[in-house]
A protein has these predicted regions:
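N-terminal regulatory/effector-sensing and dimerization cores
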Residues: 1-86
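Alpha-helix boundary/capping residues
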Residues: 73, 107-108, 161
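Long, highly charged amphipathic alpha-helices
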Residues: 64-68, 102-103, 127, 153
């Protein structure tokens, strides 16, 4: 049986399948995804195979979108449990608004020509991400993806720059 490997230059993708498929992350046990279900995945350093990409929509979500989204939620993130590295970085649930998802996925793959287009894409992707808010592990996974992107040394450099500005 043939399967497709999904590649993204962004840290996060959300898939929406219009028919039943399975997804395998890093060669582990395949996870079945029913029609009209969404899967949120961390792509960075992970090998993601899906049984079929026909009738599958993919939204690509950048570091900046994740960062802006966490800021937008305005939650105390210090209380969020740390994502377990050994866990498969995937969350799945039914999609309630496939039409919105379709537009979000299209926008996420097109370079934004204007500022308003950029804002529209951001709002659409926030809507897609917000569907996962009820999932207990969602914020842990988002923060894990963000931490993965910004290495500690970068954080320290940013912090020391801030101190320089103030002193």
């Amino acid at each position: 049986s043939t399967c497709m490997r999904i590649c993204s230059d962004q840290p996060c993708i959300v898939l929406l399948t219009e028919k039943d498929v399975w997804i395998r992350v890093n060669g582990k046990e395949p996870i079945s995804l029913k029609a009209n279900h969404m899967a949120l995945l961390n792509c960075e350093n992970n090998i993601i195979d899906v049984s079929s990409l026909n009738n599958t929509l993919v939204a690509h979500i950048s570091h900046d979108i994740i960062k802006d989204y966490l800021r937008f939620l305005n939650k105390d993130l210090s209380q969020i449990p740390v994502w377990q590295r050994s866990a498969t970085p995937i969350l799945t649930l039914p999609c309630l608004t496939p039409d919105v998802f379709r537009v979000a996925a299209q926008h996420s793959m097109m370079p934004a020509e204007t500022e308003s287009e950029k804002e529209r894409t951001r709002a659409l992707l926030f809507t897609v991400l917000s569907r996962f808010l009820d999932s207990k592990k969602f914020l842990s996974l988002m923060m894990y993806m963000l931490r993965n992107c910004v290495s500690d040394s970068v954080y320290q450099i940013i912090e020391s720059d801030i101190h320089k500005d103030w002193n």
